[in-house]
Amino acid sequence: MSELNMELKKLRELELKTQGLAARIQTAKSGEQLDVDLVQLQIENKKLKNRLFILKKSIAEESTAAGGDVSKPKESSSITEHLESVFRQAIASAFPEFRDTPVIIAPVNSTSAKFGDYQCNNAMGLSKKLKEKGINKAPRDIATELKGHCPASPIIEKLEIAGAGFVNVFLSKDYASLALSNLLRNGVKPPEVIKKRVLVDFSSPNIAKQMHVGHLRSTIIGESLCRLLEFLQHDVIRINHLGDWGTQFGMLIAHLEDRFPNYLNESPPISDLQLFYKESKKRFDEDEEFKKRAYSRVVSLQKGVPNSIKAWELICNVSRKEFQTIYERLDISVKERGESFYQSRMLSVVEYLRGKGLLEVDEGREIMWPDDTKTGIPLTIVKSDGGFTYDTSDMAAIRHRLEEELCDWIIYVVDSGQSTHFNTIFKAAERSAILNPLSHRVDHVQFGVVLGEDGKKFKTRSGDTVKLSDLLDEGMKRSLQQLESRGRDKVLTPQELKDAQESLAYGCIKYSDLCHNRISDYIFSFDKMLEDRGNTAVYLLYTYTRICSIARNSGEDFTNLPEILKKTNIVLDHEKEWKLAKTLLKLHDILIKCSKELFLHFLCEFCFEVCTVFTEFYDSCYCIEKNKQGDIIGVNHSRILLCEATAAVLRQCFYILGLKPVSKM
């Protein structure tokens, strides 16, 4: 599989680097002078050996899982990667000198069945390579050879040569029927990927400030990425890098001492922390004595004075409760690890960078350039007053995550405005040997801003930032109005109505974000997101409830699917049955694409495609047949099984996207 090949290349490079370091250590032991300290070399070599062990283990597991035997695809097989394996073997057999040529497999988007379902597009490239060796061979002839050397695969019904040298692949209905039957027996299985230890840094609100619409995208995107990676069996660490440290806490502590002098004995009744923050900021800006006291409280906080620590904890706890309320409403799970966690590690990283000679004094501060060219914007590691900065905190954090947490992959879900900052951090981490590109992956998952319907930054009518709690409340109100306009309040029980209301409200807010390319700004509109047509959560959720109702309305028991599958095969004779089955089988390819590129709108587009193709199927293929009196006279068990497979796939996708489907809406 292509991912496996990339990891094998990394492994070879890593082994060479480890061997090189071992040789340098041996040289140092023999007494020869080196520019790098022996102890540092040994530490670095130990880290590389650990990475090497983990990578070898993952590759061994993946190689065993892949097996190389295309005659026995697994439930977890991705169709594209399986076809890559088939044609990789064909290229190695027909053209051994080009066995390392990357295989090009593309889905066929034509509505005409004569072009097949997938296409191998390697013949033209191989023809060019042969020509460079003095061998003239037409791409169509090469395609014919590739076809002849393809090993038998139960996924492939037939292969045909088309055009100038394309190999069209037609999928097997028997395989599709078996794959969907297994899906119903065993649940939706994840595709096989090389397992990694991944840390996702997302949400990250600031203490003493309410979560607003600006936090919405990081929170929603981060949660869905975690769910996706967890489903793919990665070891995922969810981190909320709270803004819980800094000079602003000096004024908050000083204000707390004045407003609630007995705070050490009685928990202060701060009902509105935002107002409390504004009051302290006003005093800080207008009262010089208060400002001096605020600065002294910053110092006492940094020194760990018990009273200041207690005040800081009280303020943080008020914010935590507010954040947790939002997280529970949106079904977000994240572990708090704020800036305060890295205070001691900042001292350590500064000493580390100094020891490597990477810090320079510039106008009293200590800076670090991201690379040896000394261009761009340097990081400020130590301020002229001896204090630390966000740059220091982020360098300490990435070092902790790679060296102590032993992460293979770090994902920062932060807005596009921080792009330059994170690029600089990543380069600096690589320059200082904290980050090794051979064994680590770091990504800045950036996103655009949320706009109002006027195309400007989303604000309240008074020009204030929209509070996230107010936004969720408005969503609940709008979704209830829509349900009532459909008369659902008269059909559903109170609990069913509440479940449907929450499903629509929070689902629409999440989906309207995730269905857009995250890099783009997007317009927030309740009217558009609550439409029941087009690529909206409402359309998807309503389609899902309709699918669930089919088996329920059949008058038969479809709860024990494994037992039913013993007597019933999924038949795919009708063109709409076959189209739906092939659409469902794209799931693994889509999930792999989402995880590689970290874009979730691909999964949203897939869900929309499943729902539209299902609607075509349902309109053309009767699942339940009734007479003129409305009595059921026939139930097509195969088609209801296909409906249940569709529901299972949508359910898994909805979970990743954070949608909560209900069986009645």
From Swiss-Prot:
Q: Where is this motif: 'HIGH' region?
A: 205-216
Keywords, comma-separated and alphabetical: Aminoacyl-tRNA synthetase, ATP-binding, Cytoplasm, Ligase, Nucleotide-binding, Protein biosynthesis
Known catalytic reactions: tRNA(Arg) + L-arginine + ATP = L-arginyl-tRNA(Arg) + AMP + diphosphate
Name the Enzyme Commission number(s) assigned to this protein.
Answer: 6.1.1.19
Molecular function (GO) terms for this protein are:
arginine-tRNA ligase activity; ATP binding
Q: Which residues bind L-arginine?
A: S204, P205, N206, H215, Y390, D394, Q418
Which stretches does the entry tag as region Interaction with tRNA?
Answer: 535-549
- Identify the CDD domains for this entry: ArgRS_core
The Gene Ontology biological process annotation of the record reads: arginyl-tRNA aminoacylation
Q: Which HAMAP family match?
A: Arg_tRNA_synth
User: This chain belongs to which protein, by name?
Assistant: Probable arginine--tRNA ligase, cytoplasmic
Q: Species name for this entry?
A: Drosophila melanogaster
